Amino acid sequence: MAIANKNIIFVAGLGGIGFDTSREIVKKGPKNLVILDRIENPAAIAELKALNPKVTVTFYLYDVTVSVAESTKLLQKIFDQLKTVDLLINGAGILDDHQIERTIAVNFTGTVNTITAIMSFWDKRKGGPGGVIANVCSVTGFNAIYQVPVYSASKAAALSFTNSLAKLAPITGVTAYSINPGITKTPLLHKFNSWLDVEPRVGELLLEHPTQTSLECAQNFVKAIEANQNGAIWKVDLGTLEAIEWTKHWDSHI
């Protein structure tokens, strides 16, 4: 997918990886970049607008833990304004295994609800034009960081959901792929808790291993967007982009 002249919605586009990715997207010249985030950051929005004045950058307050109905109301405003949306990026995520319910609500349920809401506008069975979904999951969806099992499980769930969406594309007209960052230097990595405090130093321990910068991650994120491969499971790690082959151990045969 060429990003130029596209209409893009980016949920959590002002976070660590999210903001660097928003910068890289704006450089590519979309027609509209609509950022949905739960915290206002006028300086960040102003920076994006200045980076490429030809791009219309719009911000709406959005908490992914709201209901499908509330998400649909906001999306209706956006579709009324833009008429069409080409790409939805779901980037919301928290890493704090002390907050079990919120971790699941943000990392998994929120993604499901946002996508369920946008299907009202995209689903070809309802006369929609289809669309593309990029879900930010995690390499912990491949193999858990066992000291943060709630986070890891929530990301595995998001990955599984994304894989299913891709297989449903012939029915819905909506394609999907996942972006799975490895250990990336962001504020998220420094401010989290392990489940039941099983490893108080888990953040420090992770940073003792090779990492990538959020800019490196963002640049490869944009390459994945441009590749636009339905069903792709992208590993974005150590400054590289790699499509993962998923191993099938069981088949429903339906």
Curated annotation (Swiss-Prot):
It comes from the Eukaryota. One of its GO terms (molecular function) is alcohol dehydrogenase (NAD+) activity. It is an enzyme of class 1 (oxidoreductase). The active site is at residue 151. Belongs to the short-chain dehydrogenases/reductases (SDR) family. GO terms for biological process: alcohol metabolic process. NAD(+) binds at residues 10-33. PANTHER family: 15-HYDROXYPROSTAGLANDIN DEHYDROGENASE [NAD(+)], ALCOHOL DEHYDROGENASE-RELATED. InterPro entries: ADH_Drosophila-type, NAD(P)-bd_dom_sf, Sc_DH/Rdtase_CS, SDR_fam. It catalyses: a primary alcohol + NAD(+) = an aldehyde + NADH + H(+); a secondary alcohol + NAD(+) = a ketone + NADH + H(+). Homodimer. This is Alcohol dehydrogenase 1. Changing residue 187 to T: In strain: VRF. Its EC number is 1.1.1.1. The keyword Iron does not apply. One of its GO terms (cellular component) is cytoplasm. It holds the Pfam family adh_short. The keyword Nucleotide-binding does not apply. The lineage of its organism: Eukaryota, Metazoa, Ecdysozoa, Arthropoda, Hexapoda. Substrate binds at residue 138. Keywords: NAD, Oxidoreductase.
